[in-house]
């Protein structure tokens, strides 16, 4: 269940991804295991899954199966790491365990997450790492563990090793450090690729078993981390918060909601580490980046990495982190923002994402997660950017982009770094980045990976140095992009990683090659993207072009932009990945990308495998990502659009710029852009939308260029995009435009790029960093920088390059010296703080920049304001701040102040320049101080205070500045920037505005252009500033439990709620708030971007406290609330694009799964402890075609029997078509032949038989009947019929939990009377048995067992068993009970059902042939042609020996009911209606006749009473007479009638044998068939109706009902209504499954006359006899022929069909046979009958007109017989039914009279049809035999009696070899294990059921869903009732004491399907009246049409009514 929950959560967030994820997860073992929830047993396989994923990684290196690989790749690490827990996780037990906030919980969670990853939630470990502490944590844990090791050694080497080991974990061994690293990176890449990972994040939400993670996260993280985050990030956060307070809040809100839900909830499972990862990352940097750095770099790197990355901050930092998170939630800009800032930055970017996130959130949190990841990416890039970068850099420094696409190669270098810092970074960063990557990070990763990969490309050329340099460069560039800290971190990671990069680059490149497919395939990203794309498809198209342009251009900006582009692109990539997932072409494109990447890699690979493959892939992926991202972005609303637009503008601008100084400027811009775009991507993705709008001309030009690139690829978009990007990156350096030559030149360019990158790898990286810093810092300048500063950027770039070089050197040093790196990592993390802040700033800045690009003004203002806070200044400032805070706290404060002042004074550009200088200084400081910072990790907290103050100061200054700026252009720009940050839509408009300015224009121009959007931004800015101030105030002043709700007026409508250190950002606000809060921005924002909530801000925190899931966006929550059945875990595998259970069968692995049958044998031998012949495995094939008899009852076609006494265990396995993964073969059934001792079995048989015979109370079960409810498979004698008895606890829909929720003293083994001794005796038997069976269950299906005992201690009252280990909650004893095919949908998910069989004494010896036996059938499976070992001969031998008995079509007598058994609801409804009708009829009836009629109808006809009564009124004469006659008749046939009544009551058709048979044949059979015609005569019913009029049985066949109805309406209106009724009646259950189309068609009529319809049914079967006698069968005939498929027959009946049918009607059996024949062969007997019927019909019409009533009166005998039948049938149901039937009869007669056709005929027809349908093959024979009797009116009686004996040969099921029906013959004492929830199963009917001496007793042990609450859920119920009472009180207060809730009304609507009939009665009655008023219509009898539709001939005056 927990897994289910996870799935639900996953479904919530990953729902879309679940499917894509499954492909990812279906990587084989993991998929299988995780899906099965039995990862432990298959831990090796889960490992294998990880390995497989690794193998997939490895084997899939070049394979585009990255989808599976992605998750898989991520999975391996986690899988390995979490092997111990995988089982639990899979089982879901650990998930809960993991929900512990403790680290151990975290570790468990990590491991669990692994499992989850295996479950498909693990797939996105990277993302999951943030989201899924388990998953994210898992890698995180792995990383952290590794990181701890690496951190402890603080050696990037160790990091690498750890990463490698992590990878190895992924890879299944540190044997391939490179591969492992690749694996890890790929895993991360997979994570990244897993845009699915986004899902993971979402899954993280899923994973969390509650708010545990929340608790952990909040508990640990928020306190310190929040403060630190606030202090460190606060400046950024402040600025960002100001900028993106809304967006931040939005991000936080959405992310808080999602993340709290997700991460907190997720972390629940993941111990909150994921939150920590995001929060931690965010927070860690806020902690001071140093903390993060320390955490990442130092052992803390391990812990921080682990904790921080894993939201550890989760266990160790969790309080802080959560506090930070809370704080972040509280204070958008505060450290919580770290996560949330990352989130917020993402939020800023994701503001759009937020708005988008609304979309994203709406998509199920996927997008949101994506956004979150984007946010986190931003946060990650900003806050966790270090981690992300580091982790991304270290793990994916080259692979950040690469990791998405190039992840495998580039991440290798970074992997090394990642382990120490990279790991923590990776964990934090990668986790966040992964989260981002799946969301934003995916984009960022793509870009970053691209950037890094690109930078790695040069390293590629000089493998180690180049990679080294390249990695640092990408790292730096990415860090700048992501964060200053990130830069440093990345540099650290990059530095360390780069060396590894060269080594690992190739593997990673290979991996990347695979990863890109993974990336491309990332289903989750794709899903997110898809979701986003749906929202943003247009934007995506634009954004894609833009992004492509951007990508094309960014390749020039390769380093900078790729990172950001990756930020952007990854989103796009996610989007595109989603697309890919959606569009197989996309994965192939992505895969193609990898190929291009690989090719490029091969070219560039020489130098840097990572770079070539990685860069191309990055470029490609970035493009892809951008494309996808664009899709996502656009999906992500404007956030991505703007970011894209910005990026595109940036790209456009940087295109030349890129081309100008591709290495430097381009890299920086690109990285910058990417970084910004990444962050801003959320931001600017909206901006992109806006940009697209604003910059559409320029952008479009760019995009057109890109489009030329991109669009050539639009599907290959990703592929080309990436190469374009690379080419663009290369080309820009080549100063050739990306768009045109990009793809061609991409490879070369990639090489060139790589060379260039190599040439400027560090410079670019450093420049990127510094330029990012300066770019960010000098955003205004750099805004122009892209344009005007492109030139200066060259120089600047070089300066930056130098600075970057220093940083890079430091990074390299860090890389070289783990401790140095750790220190640097710390510094980087400090930088991350700064960088994250800066990144936030960068993001904002780049968002600003891009907005500038897009909306020239925005960038400057943003630069000035937001840029300063979010972009350059925050980045610089933050870097500065972080470093300064760390190094120069006071200096930072002064600098910050100065910077703020400067920003204020200097307008955007000067401030930006200052910021850039500072940033450079900071970069230098960072570069050098980074190590110090790493060393001065401890400094970070103090610096945090300083930073906090500085941040506050800065925030205030920035506020002022922003205000000032807002007033001028800066103001508008800033506000716009803020707005974009705040409001994605706002950004989007900015993006549009940005779009307006040429992207190539200088940033200044862009900034100016951004000014116009400022108006909107001003509002937001103000709110952001206010919010920031409030946040600061709250943060500083708020008491721990002070709760405030801040409503930010951002597009996202972020609500910030703070309670002490916990800040909850909710994006959801009321629509009114939305309207009021985001006037300008909201106007800009699309409605999709708005996520109004019904909850007030104040309630959010409370709700969160109550349940984190309540914080989820509504769409996500709805997903959570959706039934589990649709959210099964699909393991990710590469075998198929999408798992279609309809085709391959249900997928689950908790009974066992393996790659082949031999593996299953190994598993089962290991479990069972015996080998060889003791275990028998049979292959079965899923066909999806249900084998059943003509009546719809179970049949067996193959019987698998015990072959010998040596055989102890039988295992049925299904080979999943098209799968070669670890779950290619799954176990679907396990049968232990000797399950319990025979002595015990004997004793239980006798004891249970005796007890249940005397005291048992039958349990009505729907599966007791066929779909028509007409079979008597349980027997007809209520005293002996088969029955089921339920004991123990079961699920109740009323309580949504245990049915004993309100019981003070629940009697779980309740028997008749009050005999506690008997109950105790029975209980002891069943408790002992359940205790005995549990160990067997545990041994044979450990995964399912573990799933079922997960909550044993929580809900002991709902468990059976006397010892520890109680998997069962209830048991059902079935005695000779024929269970029709069904699934036990109420069972818990990932559990199974155990059936203990006890047989009669004559069936206990092996080899004996019992007189009768009951088989357990799987109706959808057929036996394989080969045996376990693939031998056809051996299989044939089994068939010869009897081990497999092949059955053939055999005739057998079947028991059918005269009419369908009514449901309890119907019976209640009828009784209720009868009473009501009685009163109304007494009051309103003007005639005694009416009164009499109404009274009987009221009493006997509840549903149809009113209609029948009205009809009777219309036909009063006939009505009363009919009633009278019917009444007497019921008396006559009372014996059968009571039986029938009993039968309906018991819902077991066995009671009324005679009446049942007659009724059944005449009416019941037809009724059900009309309702749901059986294979033979499902159509006859309709046919008849149709035939009567349309006489086109074939056509009628299809539109039977409608035709019948239409025909009736047309030819005989009265008939029509009645046929409608008849059809309706037949349709009554609306079972048209068997093809009773007529029922469907008639449904309108049925609906209209449903009450009558039923009576007609009842009437019908009674009328069967009477009809034959009455010669009313014309309509009946029509029905039958049509039903029988005899067109000519039907046609005949149309003219004289009534008569013919009448003949049929006369002997319902005969008629049925006719019909039956008609069904089989159109109707030769029918023809004979036709003549007969024609005569009868001829006679009948006279009868019909007057005789109808006369008939009812006069033909008392026939009618009386009919009535008798009717009475019996009605009696069966109720007297009211009886009356109703009579009325129906009257009505029928009336209609008939009106139509000239007796309505009784339709009834009879129905009867006949039913009989025929009922599989009255006998009737066919009987038809011949009874034709004469049919001719005779009296013949009907015998016919009705004959109906009792219906024969079926089930021939149709045997004719088609693909129709299933594999049965096993359970023996005495055997135990059968199967997943009854997922597999359709049945038990065959017995020849002579006798529950007093049963042939078989089956004791079914199960555990229902939601049986996990103590005391049967009493507390929950009481709370629910209290809530209802409170609501009632509120309603009373609101509406007054007299207010009555509309409860009953709603129920009435549900309960009273008859009411609609009443409503239609007026029409119906009017119709009948009008028909009756006119002359009888002459039915046409010679109409035979071969057309699909019957020609309805309407004759008579009433045709005008048709």
From Swiss-Prot:
UniProt function note: Dioxygenase that catalyzes the conversion of the modified genomic base 5-methylcytosine (5mC) into 5-hydroxymethylcytosine (5hmC) and plays a key role in active DNA demethylation. Has a preference for 5-hydroxymethylcytosine in CpG motifs. Also mediates subsequent conversion of 5hmC into 5-formylcytosine (5fC), and conversion of 5fC to 5-carboxylcytosine (5caC). Conversion of 5mC into 5hmC, 5fC and 5caC probably constitutes the first step in cytosine demethylation.
EC number(s) on record? 1.14.11.80
Q: What is this protein called?
A: Methylcytosine dioxygenase TET2
Q: Which residues carry this modification: Phosphoserine?
A: 15, 75, 99, 1107, 1109
Mutagenesis / variant outcome for changing residue 1875 to R = In a myelodysplastic syndrome; somatic mutation
User: What Pfam families would the database entry show?
Assistant: Tet_JBP (PF12851)
Instruction: Write down the required cofactor(s).
Output: Fe(2+); Zn(2+)
Q: Where does Zn(2+) 3 bind?
A: 1289, 1298, 1358, 1912
Name where it's found.
Answer: Nucleus; Chromosome
Q: Which residues bind Zn(2+) 1?
A: 1133, 1135, 1219, 1221
Q: Which GO terms describe its biological process?
A: chromosomal 5-methylcytosine DNA demethylation, oxidation pathway; leukocyte differentiation; myeloid cell differentiation; positive regulation of gene expression via chromosomal CpG island demethylation; positive regulation of transcription by RNA polymerase II; protein O-linked glycosylation
The record gives the effect of mutating residue 1926 to H as: In a chronic myelomonocytic leukemia sample; somatic mutation
- Record carries keyword DNA damage: no
- Listed binding positions for Zn(2+) 2 are 1193, 1271, 1273, 1380
Where is the stretch described as Interaction with DNA?
1290-1303
Species name: Homo sapiens
Tell me the residue numbers annotated for binding substrate: 1387, 1902-1904
What outcome is documented for mutating residue 1299 to E in this protein? Answer: In a refractory anemia sample; loss of monoubiquitination, chromatin binding and 5-methylcytosine demethylase activity in vivo, when tested in a heterologous system
Report the principal subcellular site.
Answer: nucleus
**Result after altering residue 666 to G:** In a chronic myelomonocytic leukemia sample; somatic mutation
* Family recorded in the similarity comment: Belongs to the TET family.
Describe the effect of residue 1245 to S.
Answer: In a myeloproliferative disorder; somatic mutation
